């Protein structure tokens, strides 16, 4: 009997957890990160303020909401040559240098990709593989590098070249 009560309690608790998670996630983008057998779902929202683009992130972890942000100056959005791989830490608000972006390509790199079907980022050349996929009404530019086998899918949107997926 105790075993059945315990199982019922767990089922009710898990259903309530799902309801709470739905209340937290409204209309921002939800990205899933998988690394070393771990999976994390991050909520991203983007806000422009003056000459800086802010990526605010959040995640529910251990029944607690954690959040932070990345700030990308306008110069970085135009001419950056590197992706930042700084891991999000709760409460951290990171101002990226003008050479780096997070989750976006710079306008220069995007133009290079569109005109030459290749671009350089993090001292690596990525070449266009295909444009078969779509997300949010945009084609995704599938690129890969021949050295490490990294693949990225980038939204074909010159105003907002969001990196949709990395493998």
Question: Where do the PLM segments sit?
Answer:
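Acidic, serine/threonine-rich low-complexity disordered tracts
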Residues: 22-87, 91-167
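Sec/Tat signal peptide C-region and signal peptidase I cleavage site
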Residues: 16-21
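Sec-dependent N-terminal signal peptides
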Residues: 4-15
């Amino acid at each position: 009997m105790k075993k059945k009560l315990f199982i019922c309690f767990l089922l009710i608790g898990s259903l309530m957890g799902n309801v709470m998670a739905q209340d937290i996630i409204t209309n921002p983008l939800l990205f899933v990160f998988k690394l070393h057998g771990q999976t994390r779902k991050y909520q991203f929202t983007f806000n422009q303020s003056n000459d800086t683009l802010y990526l605010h992130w959040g995640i529910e972890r251990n029944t607690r909401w954690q959040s932070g942000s990345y700030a990308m100056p306008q110069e970085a959005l135009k001419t950056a040559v590197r992706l930042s791989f700084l891991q999000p830490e709760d409460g951290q608000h990171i101002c990226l240098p003008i050479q780096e972006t997070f989750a976006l390509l710079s306008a220069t790199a995007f133009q290079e990709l569109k005109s030459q079907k290749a671009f350089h980022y993090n001292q690596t050349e990525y070449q266009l593989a295909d444009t078969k996929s779509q997300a949010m009404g945009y084609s995704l530019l599938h690129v890969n590098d021949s050295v490490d086998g990294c693949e990225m899918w980038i939204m074909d949107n010159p105003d907002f070249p969001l990196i949709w997926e990395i493998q």
